[in-house]
Amino acid sequence: MKTSMQRKLDQLTTRLAELNDLLSREDITSNLDQYRKLTREHAELGPVVDHYALWRQAMNDATTAQELLADASMRDFAEDEIRAARERMEKLGAELQKMLLPKDPNDDRNIFLEIRAGTGGDESALFAGDLLRMYLRFAERNRWQVEMMSASESDLGGYKEVIVRIAGEAAYSKLKFESGGHRVQRVPATETQGRIHTSACTVAVMPEADEIGEVEINPADLRIDTFRASGAGGQHINKTDSAVRVTHLPTGIVVECQDDRSQHKNKDRALKVLAARIKDKQSHEQQAKEAATRKSLIGSGDRSERIRTYNFPQGRLTDHRINLTLYRLDAIMDGDLDELIAALVSEHQAELLASLGDAD
């Protein structure tokens, strides 16, 4: 283990002891906000410090066994002990490296998931519906809550555009690598000759702002229009101007919400989505600056980048960023995304470790 890493772990051990003292003080426990903040920090540091204690124990075991090598009768035993202790140190050291990786501040946030049909017309809209079902099934498996924010349905089913809010533990950390272009290859239901067509959708995963105030939005920068909500094919579904369109003039970002009969609720939803889109835009601008110095395969989230192909005739999914191919498309489309997400997270961690190594 590098000296710099050991020094950092010693500091965290000291900090955990400080937190134990602070959390036992009456002036801290009576201040709910401060108590929550310190409790969260304690929960994050605990596993790291525990791992470090095991690493130090393994190092002590190796040192003790080293002293036994001089005794011929104990040499074989000592060599076995040293080997086992070093293996534990190596394993724990690798785990500690990952634990110390910079944490994405958005990882614990709820998200807005936006799917837009792209090239391919009706087939693209149908695939957008299939992607939505895939993510909703994954949300069910994780016991996340889902709320429909906005939907523009196509005439033959599916969606031209759909936005849902997904709330639950680690929603952003698990789905943040889904942003980008998703391509499908299959025989459309409308195809009479049995030919395989290619179409595409784009997915955007945006962390929800904790409060709308977290993203600075000047009311003077907003244009808010109301209109009658309409369903698929353009038919009006109610007779009041309950649908809301919010335009953020400085960025040109437009959000429409019409799924609720209440204009107030639609406006509230639209403002939440707008805040998330502005935050997402700011985040991407920051990432673009960082990308000038370090190219990331996984985390760019570029909407125009084709990240994945779903080949239905072959039952194959390919993630082009990490050259991963899985022949279990039916299960994946039914929401079984764990293997895919684990591979993306692992690659992202490897990139972070490599960048830290370069920095050293």
Curated annotation (Swiss-Prot):
Compartments in which it is found: Cytoplasm
Region (Disordered), start-end ranges: 280-300
Disulphide-bridged cysteine pairs: none
GO molecular function annotation: translation release factor activity, codon specific
Recorded coiled-coil stretches: none
Chain intervals with Basic and acidic residues compositional bias: 280-293
GO cellular component: cytoplasm
Principal place of residence: cytoplasm
NCBIfam families: prfA, PRK00591.1
Its biological purpose: Peptide chain release factor 1 directs the termination of translation in response to the peptide chain termination codons UAG and UAA.
Similarity comment text for this entry: Belongs to the prokaryotic/mitochondrial release factor family.
Name of the protein: Peptide chain release factor 1
Species: Paraburkholderia phytofirmans (strain DSM 17436 / LMG 22146 / PsJN) (Burkholderia phytofirmans)
